[in-house]
A protein has these predicted regions:
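Positively charged, aromatic-enriched nucleic acid-contacting surfaces
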Residues: 112-114
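N-terminal presequence-like segments and the immediate start of the first folded domain
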Residues: 1-53, 116-136
């Protein structure tokens, strides 16, 4: 396959202008009151993060007293949100207005370095009742 036919997703970009709203992303494989009119394929958002030394020190101190380790919780939530936003951007770039079957996956690439992948199927949907309008 020539390099001209390969779609690339920019990962260092300014905030995207969405045509896929967060409300139009689901873990289900169908959307109530909508019909899928076109499947555009798999879309994904990948973020690779490492822990910083100061956060690791703070988390170590929190483990001594127990409870929720807020430093890691915040890092995990921020990373998942970023991967999700990149997935939505990718769906927008391929012309989708919804994503079905959304999932997350994580992989530890090396000590302290983790990849978070958000993925799903980009689709074009339309309301089942023609009088209703799609809201992005």
């Amino acid at each position: 396959m020539s390099s001209e036919n390969v779609q690339r997703v920019p990962y260092a970009v300014s905030p995207p202008r969405y045509s896929v709203s967060h409300q139009m992303v689901t873990t289900a494989f169908e959307m109530p009151n909508y019909r899928i009119v076109q499947n555009l394929g798999v879309v994904r958002g990948i973020v690779v993060r490492s822990r910083n030394v100061f956060a690791t020190l703070g988390a170590t101190l929190q483990t001594i007293v127990g409870g929720n380790i807020t430093v890691w919780t915040r890092l995990c939530e921020d990373t998942r949100r970023d991967a999700f936003d990149i997935m939505i951007q990718h769906a927008t770039e391929v012309g989708a207005n919804a994503v079905i079957g959304a999932r997350y996956d994580t992989t530890e690439l090396s000590a302290g370095v983790t990849e978070v992948l958000a993925y799903g199927t980009a689709v074009i949907v339309e309301p089942v009742n023609p009088g209703e309008s799609y809201r992005s």
